[in-house]
Amino acid sequence: MEGRIPLIGEEFPRVEVKTTHGKKVLPDDFRGKWFVLFSHPADFTPVCTTEFVAFQKRYDEFRKLNTELIGLSIDQVFSHIKWIEWIKEKLGVEIEFPVIADDLGEVSRRLGLIHPNKGTNTVRAVFIVDPNGIIRAIVYYPQEVGRNIDEILRAVKALQTSDEKGVAIPANWPSNELINDSVIVPPASSVEEARKRLESKDFECYDWWFCYKKV
């Protein structure tokens, strides 16, 4: 259904887009890499400007995680270019990641980025997509609230750690109030496994269903 929000665990819809770096096909052009697609309401607006600067300041950290950034709004490509030039000239920050020019709003509608009572501008959405093109996380912010880049980076790191180690990630990781930077071991699936887990020196446990370890 047009406008339906794609779901976590689904493949990111295949879309051909025009960007400030030329034409691209998502998710195909990012196969083998993670990518974060984030939409913003409009160019030449204060909150969006702070977000773009914040994303750029952390761009190297994303790339060290094999993760690319790509922005999107319902603006024409020349508007993106002029805004990026303004950011470089006035703020001394060069935006290095591509920005999708969705001037007709077709991609935004397909991804469910236009919400009721918000006109034709997109909300502040974040899609985290893995190297296989699967959507792993979706976050929506209202137009009035800028995003926290630390949390987006944390989510990417957490998903990658979960995939690599087969573990779950606690709240506020890696500074959790109970287990600090440890990760949660999946619960035991049998009585015998639960007993062995409590006796194991590989984990620390509050109980058989709540065990954790360092990674």
From Swiss-Prot:
Residues engaged in binding substrate: 124
Segments forming domain Thioredoxin: 6-161
Main EC class the enzyme belongs to: oxidoreductase
Active site location: 48
Location in the cell: Cytoplasm
InterPro entries listed in its UniProt record: AhpC/TSA, Peroxiredoxin, Peroxiredoxin_AhpC-typ, Peroxiredoxin_C, Peroxiredoxin_TDXH, PRX_1cys, Thioredoxin-like_sf, Thioredoxin_domain
Keyword Disulfide bond among UniProt keywords: yes
Gene3D superfamilies: Antioxidant, Horf6, Chain A, domain2, Glutaredoxin
Domain of life: Bacteria
Disulphides: 205-211
Signal peptide residues on this chain, from the entry's feature table: none
Function comment: Thiol-specific peroxidase that catalyzes the reduction of hydrogen peroxide and organic hydroperoxides to water and alcohols, respectively. Plays a role in cell protection against oxidative stress by detoxifying peroxides.
Additional notes on this entry: The active site is a conserved redox-active cysteine residue, the peroxidatic cysteine (C(P)), which makes the nucleophilic attack on the peroxide substrate. The peroxide oxidizes the C(P)-SH to cysteine sulfenic acid (C(P)-SOH), which then reacts with another cysteine residue, the resolving cysteine (C(R)), to form a disulfide bridge. The disulfide is subsequently reduced by an appropriate electron donor to complete the catalytic cycle.
Family membership: Belongs to the peroxiredoxin family. Prx6 subfamily.
Subunit record text: Homodecamer. Pentamer of dimers that assemble into a ring structure.
UniProt protein name: Peroxiredoxin
